[in-house]
Amino acid sequence: MTKQFTMEDRFNPSAVEQALYQHWESRGYFKPSEDINAPSYCIAIPPPNVTGSLHMGHAFQQTLMDTLIRFNRMEGNNTLWQTGTDHAGIATQMVVERKIAAEEGKTRHDYGREAFINKIWDWKAYSGGTISQQMRRLGNSIDWDRERFTMDEGLSNAVKEVFVRLHEEGLIYRGKRLVNWDPKLHTAISDLEVENKESKGSLWHFRYPLANGAKTAEGLDYLVVATTRPETMLGDTAVAVHPEDERYQSLIGKTVVLPLANREIPIIADEYVDREFGTGVVKITPAHDFNDYEVGKRHGLPMVNVMTLNADIRAEAEIIGTDGKPLAGYDAPIPADYQGLERFVARKKIVADFEALGLLDQIKPHDLKVPYGDRGGVPIEPMLTDQWYVSVKPLAEVATKAVENGEIQFVPKQYENLYFSWMRDIQDWCISRQLWWGHRIPAWYDEQGNVYVARDEAEVRSKYGLTSDVALKQDEDVLDTWFSSGLWTFSTLGWPEQTKELKMFHPTDVLITGFDIIFFWVARMIMFTMHFIKDENGKPQVPFKTVYVTGLIRDEQGQKMSKSKGNVLDPIDMIDGISLEDLLEKRTGNMMQPQLAEKIAKATRKEFEHGISAHGTDALRFTLAALASNGRDINWDMKRLEGYRNFCNKLWNASRYVLTHEKLDLSEGEAEYSLADRWIESQFNRTIDAFRTALKQYRFDLVANTIYDFTWNQFCDWYLELTKPVFAHGTDAQKRGTSRMLLNILEKLLRLAHPIIPFITEEIWQKLKGVMKLSGDTIMLQPFPHAEESKFDPVAESQMDWLKEVIVAVRNIRAECNISPSHALELLLRNISEETKICLENNRTLLQSMAKLSTITLLDANEEPPLSVTKLVENNEIFIPMAGFINKEQELTRLTKEIEKLKGEIVRIENKLSNEAFITKAPEQVIAKEREKMQGYLDNIEKLQQQYQAIETL
């Protein structure tokens, strides 16, 4: 047959990928159908923050998602990958604030709320566009017409609906409680936004005088209180000891005089106190410490707030009861000397004043963790502020049961324990933030401070019967970003409207996310979804059936990637490549800490001396899938990326060999299939089976390795080579059989690999389509291969394994003895079974061609070969006569190594057989098999030793 056409020598991703993607998108291949009865499959993407661009973690998770989406689309499921971005309140507001400060020298207050928010919308339009273009470059098969943003009108309506309903159910309330307060950004922040930094600090031991003549067991008239935060002592409302601490039991219920403030506070007993810490006596400051806050609630202590929102000492303390309301009748004046002082200035003065009064007992060095706001960059302050809260316990109970009873499964399973530990000890959730960017809280206040909650002001007036002359002002605060994110799976499908999409695609199938947001996002999605979404029988619906938890992508040294470390890798640079100069600019430009630039530049030059070369999207995706071992962090590996680029080239070259082969015969007529044809078909069907099993278990690494192993090690390295003798010497029927098998396996292999490497598989498939006269416009809508058990052929596999081992043995002898491939060798075989003889006769031409043999001769059992190099394949002896080209010393060394290797195997089996535990537990047939193996090794050693002696006498 004449050549079909020409194919480029190498696959060029940059010439193919973007054009292919535009074609896919324009043809609507990513869209689900409107068929409400079709089996559906849906993934909701974790929405990237609109603040910037995608990083390697996004590329990693999105590759896994797209693999599942493409697979399910090929399986015939009505498939939706719901995408969008998150408004990321505090992060986005800070980016834009920094931008206007740098470019215009202005603050948000110079703009005012409305104008500043318009600035953020402009930024969102720019940044969101960048993210969606990057996602296209990754090959993500997303329905872009359904792209959502957490502050879209539809999603905003869902947020208001949830807030109002929860408020009406008594599950949202406003109260004064302790929160993480960022004194620089002037907002409450979540635990996720708090970074605990190791710090060398001090433990101050202060003397608090006992009141009313009381004495300790040692006769002292004071208690020594240990603290790491002297600046909060003006707000102390008790000192606490452990109830079983005998040193202080007699003092429980008595009082001390709080130094500097000169007021009496009680000595209380609480099991929270660690008897071993400091002196076993701690000060309790409920308004400025989370643990003290809980102690205060247990003991009904007043909360004395001594700090402003700037973290300066107040002129007048704010005194709050345990109910969160102002407390009358408790006096806690702040001495004038401290009023207005910044907190750390106040700390120094308080310590100095204790010393001047003779009340500073001692100062000890102390290692501690100081909580910092991860964006404001200053120590956060536990602060009593008015905030909105969700009472989540009732929601958490339902959400916990969903995981307990298996409605939702975590992969890997160990993350369920992390989920349970959080959910079973859940606290009310502070949902308000003192920001401008975000969902404004749907609550209004009249001039008397009464609060009205509704979806908008018009509804407030009708719901509460307020006339137009009643002035109303909306709450200034916005909702925590996680509040709107928690509605993501159903709000993006049109809720609160009962849409067709909601019916078709909810619950979604799997969520792929990082372990660090299991509580902050995953748990809240489960709680909100099960509270608001019910099936037709009124049963709470889960947001997804499986949560697949990924590890982090770290750099090659195992370090977390971060801008400050200068080790961030951009997935687009892996695809397109980047020069060293541009990489240096990217890593050191616009740094928050410019002093690190030189160190980062040096490390970058060392690691990427010539920049990063282009690898294409498929190589990046294949690498990410291959590295995805369950739940573990991943160290990025450029060598693996290069290796998988080579893999893509290998697939391209194999396809080129097939499609441009001048003897490819697709004519009608009888076809005869060779042993190699039957073997590759059997191996391929086992590969399909292994792929499906691995994907079902979310073992993306095994999925990738399965494709790699078959393509490289079986199809390319063996089968393509095995076709050459057929095309050279076979009958027409044999050529037709091999031609059909080549094309059939290649076409199915492209379909098998398509979910992970979509571009190269589509490009080759389009070329193959014409040759094979296939119907269909795109590979992505072709059916995914199913394993056909009828094609499993253990006999062909066994025979082919034997032939391959013989070929490898002969090739190894050539290499070890430095014999040219052009020199045809004689092959002598001894100790061959009747079954193997038949296999040999049927495949003699193939074996001669593949191993480059002049003759193949069978020896009788007792027939001695001429002086030869010997190899063993199973129990078969292989001899290559060495007359004229043996290197005696080299051959003796090789035999010695072979004998030592077998002796090692014998020692291993002897150890096993002398192990009582093994002998007791192992089945009899396993023990018999080990003994049989050992005897085989002993026989082989004897034969090799005879060979050694024969060569030694040369």
UniProtKB/Swiss-Prot annotation:
One of its GO terms (biological process) is valyl-tRNA aminoacylation. Belongs to the class-I aminoacyl-tRNA synthetase family. ValS type 1 subfamily. The lineage of its organism: Bacteria, Pseudomonadati, Pseudomonadota, Gammaproteobacteria, Pasteurellales. Monomer. Residues 883-954 form a coiled coil. The gene is valS. It holds the Pfam family Val_tRNA-synt_C. It is found in: Cytoplasm. One of its GO terms (cellular component) is cytosol. A motif ('HIGH' region) lies at residues 48-58. Keywords: Aminoacyl-tRNA synthetase, ATP-binding, Coiled coil, Cytoplasm, Ligase, Nucleotide-binding, Protein biosynthesis. It catalyses: tRNA(Val) + L-valine + ATP = L-valyl-tRNA(Val) + AMP + diphosphate. It comes from Histophilus somni (strain 2336) (Haemophilus somnus). HAMAP family: Val_tRNA_synth_type1 (MF_02004). PANTHER family: VALINE--TRNA LIGASE, CHLOROPLASTIC_MITOCHONDRIAL 2, VALYL-TRNA SYNTHETASES. Catalyzes the attachment of valine to tRNA(Val). As ValRS can inadvertently accommodate and process structurally similar amino acids such as threonine, to avoid such errors, it has a 'posttransfer' editing activity that hydrolyzes mischarged Thr-tRNA(Val) in a tRNA-dependent manner. This is Valine--tRNA ligase. A motif ('KMSKS' region) lies at residues 560-564. Its EC number is 6.1.1.9. ATP binds at residue 563. It comes from the Bacteria. ValRS has two distinct active sites: one for aminoacylation and one for editing. The misactivated threonine is translocated from the active site to the editing site. GO terms for molecular function: aminoacyl-tRNA deacylase activity; ATP binding; valine-tRNA ligase activity. Its main location: cytoplasm. NCBIfam families: PRK05729.1, valS.
